[in-house]
Amino acid sequence: MGTRFLLALFLVLLVLGFEVQGAPLPQQEESAGPALLTQMRESLSGYWDSAKAAASSLYQKTYLPAVDEKLRDMYSKSTAAVSTYAGIFTDQVLSMLRGEE
């Protein structure tokens, strides 16, 4: 499936490349307006800001202190467990690399 996906992606990019090469644009003056990159950046910034505002308002509407406390407790317990098991794993790997002395 991976090779089929790569082949399909390659063909799509190839067709798009030929489309771009086959459609010449009329010459425009560079000082006519803001560059395309600037317009895209402003557009993406606007989308990002609206998404942040929507997520923030949704979070504020659904905020429950009890759930927040449970999430914080689960996070602290899980990070403690992960750090413990990471230490054990590191010790095991180091002892395997050193060998028996």
Swiss-Prot record:
Lineage, opening ranks: Eukaryota, Metazoa, Chordata, Craniata, Vertebrata
Gene3D superfamilies listed in its UniProt record: Apolipoprotein C-II
Localization, UniProt: Secreted
Gene (name only): APOC2
Pfam families: Apo-CII
Gene Ontology MF terms: phospholipase activator activity; phospholipase binding
Gene Ontology, cellular component aspect: chylomicron; high-density lipoprotein particle; low-density lipoprotein particle; very-low-density lipoprotein particle
Post-translational modification: Proapolipoprotein C-II is synthesized as a sialic acid containing glycoprotein which is subsequently desialylated prior to its proteolytic processing. Proapolipoprotein C-II, the major form found in plasma undergoes proteolytic cleavage of its N-terminal hexapeptide to generate apolipoprotein C-II, which occurs as the minor form in plasma.
PANTHER family: APOLIPOPROTEIN C-II
Region (Lipid binding): 66-74
Domain of life: Eukaryota
Family: Belongs to the apolipoprotein C2 family.
Name assigned to this protein: Apolipoprotein C-II
Cleaved signal peptide residues: 1-22
